[in-house]
A protein has these predicted regions:
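C-terminal binding/interaction regions
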Residues: 5-15, 19-20, 96-159
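Glycine-rich phosphate/diphosphate-binding loop of Rossmann-like nucleotide-binding domains
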Residues: 13-33, 38
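Short, conserved beta-strand edge motifs with alternating hydrophobic and charged residues
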Residues: 15, 39-42, 68-72
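Short amphipathic alpha-helical segments
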Residues: 25-28, 80-84, 124
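Short, structured coil segments at secondary-structure junctions
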Residues: 34, 86-88, 106
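A short beta-strand-loop structural module common to alpha/beta enzyme folds
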Residues: 37-49
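Helix-adjacent hinge/juxtasegments
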Residues: 52, 56-93
């Protein structure tokens, strides 16, 4: 893994629901310490995780942020909701290998974490692995292209 201190810096959106404020705050401090620009788009008291996931994913889809991090209880709901935004590939990250592969094989722009399923230290290690990994292309490129084709065929809900 590349040294996290010498990695490229990104504009990163981050969002969480009420289950994950402590992990989100630790991630913001970690990311800013490494030179990233972080925008907190977390839930307000009247919002649920799908609202946050959509707001964060749209910011990536519009090019306002290059990467994003979403945190809820498991990371699953955030990933499902974020993946509803066209052009977004969000991955739930349970371990460092998955974090690396989410970027290298799937070109995931959004990493989703579960505050109730992974500890803060492990999540920060995974976050570093995800941030220093780049899309490898190669044999994965045609598969990511197929994901984009599936998405474009299904932008209109079938009757």
């Amino acid at each position: 893994m590349q040294d996290p201190q010498t990695e490229q810096s990104y504009r990163i959106a981050i969002g969480c629901d009420d289950a994950a404020f402590a992990m989100k705050d630790a991630m913001i401090a970690h990311l800013e310490e490494r030179g990233h620009t972080v925008t907190d788009l977390s839930a307000t008291p009247d919002e649920d995780y799908p609202d946050v996931a959509e707001r964060v994913a749209r910011s990536v889809a519009r090019g306002e942020h290059e990467r994003a991090v979403l945190v809820c209880g498991t990371g699953i709901g955030m990933a499902i909701a974020a993946n509803k935004v066209p052009g977004i590939r969000a991955a739930q990250i349970p371990d460092s290998y998955s974090a690396e592969r989410a970027r290298k094989s799937n070109d995931a722009q959004i990493a989703c974490f579960g505050s109730r399923t992974i500890g803060v230290h492990a999540a920060l290690v995974c976050l570093d692995h995800w941030l220093v990994s780049d899309f490898a292309g190669g044999g994965s490129a045609p598969k990511v292209e197929k994901i984009k084709q599936v998405e474009s065929r299904n932008l209109v809900v079938p009757a």
